[in-house]
């Protein structure tokens, strides 16, 4: 029996919802709308040395996590748009570990990514609020996945994803006494 590493997965692993539930979608949209503020609070007051500290041994730095959340949110927003405007679009994954090595993720201050998240999440939440149940049932086809994914599952996944990485930062702060 394997155990989940609580430092890597402080809120547990993603559990896909089995079915569409409007009340879940409302909660996910609220969480997506609130993520930029939650993330900004999680990094508030951290200095450059702290921002350049890995959240775990072998993990990304806090700054890389912030930049990754901007990258992932852009991808999620575009995947949602493709799912709404195309018939079962093929979704190319992005190489997260490689993106985290790029110059912007390694050396840029976090403020541009925080600002990007603020604007993007307003647009994304507004788009999600406009969607019907039929829209949320539309499918995307992630490359390499065993089956197509409905947009409601994509929304749940990225809700978890934002909370997951914010919790990693908060866990590091607690462990370090920051």
UniProtKB/Swiss-Prot annotation:
**EC number annotated for this UniProt entry:** 3.-.-.-
Required cofactors, per record? Zn(2+)
GO MF, one term, reads: zinc ion binding
Q: Which family does it belong to?
A: Belongs to the metal hydrolase YfiT family.
Kinase found in the keyword field: no
Repeat found in the keyword field:
no
**One GO cellular component from the entry?**
cytoplasm
Per UniProt, Zn(2+) binds at: 68, 161, 165
Q: How is this protein organized at the quaternary level?
A: Homodimer.
Q: Cofactor comment in the record?
A: Binds 1 zinc ion per subunit.
What is the top-level taxon of the source organism? Bacteria
UniProt-listed Pfam families: DinB_2
Q: What does this protein do?
A: Possible metal-dependent hydrolase.
- Kindly state which keywords UniProt assigns to this record, in alphabetical order: Cytoplasm, Hydrolase, Metal-binding, Zinc
Q: What is this protein called?
A: Putative metal-dependent hydrolase GTNG_0529
Query: What HAMAP family is this protein classified in?
Result: YfiT_hydrol
Principal EC category: hydrolase
Please give the InterPro entries that the UniProt record associates with this protein: DinB-like, DinB/YfiT-like, Put_metal_dep_hydrolase_YfiT
Where is this chain's protein located in or outside the cell? Answer: Cytoplasm
């Amino acid at each position: 029996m394997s155990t989940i590493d609580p430092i890597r997965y402080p809120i547990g692993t993603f559990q896909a919802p089995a079915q569409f539930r409007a009340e879940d979608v409302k909660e996910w949209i609220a969480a997506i709308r609130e993520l930029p503020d939650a993330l900004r609070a999680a990094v508030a007051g951290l200095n450059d040395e702290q921002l350049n500290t890995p959240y775990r041994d072998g993990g990304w730095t806090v700054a890389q996590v912030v930049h990754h959340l901007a990258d992932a949110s852009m991808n999620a927003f575009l995947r949602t748009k493709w799912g709404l405007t195309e018939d079962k679009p093929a979704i190319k994954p992005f190489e997260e570990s490689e993106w985290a090595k790029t110059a912007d993720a390694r050396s840029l201050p976090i403020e541009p990514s925080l600002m990007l998240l603020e604007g993007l999440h307003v647009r994304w939440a507004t788009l999600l609020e406009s969607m019907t149940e039929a829209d949320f049932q539309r499918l995307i086809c992630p490359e390499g996945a065993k089956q197509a994914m409905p947009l409601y599952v994509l929304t749940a996944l990225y809700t978890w994803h934002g909370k997951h990485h914010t919790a990693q930062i908060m866990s590091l702060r607690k462990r370090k006494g920051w």
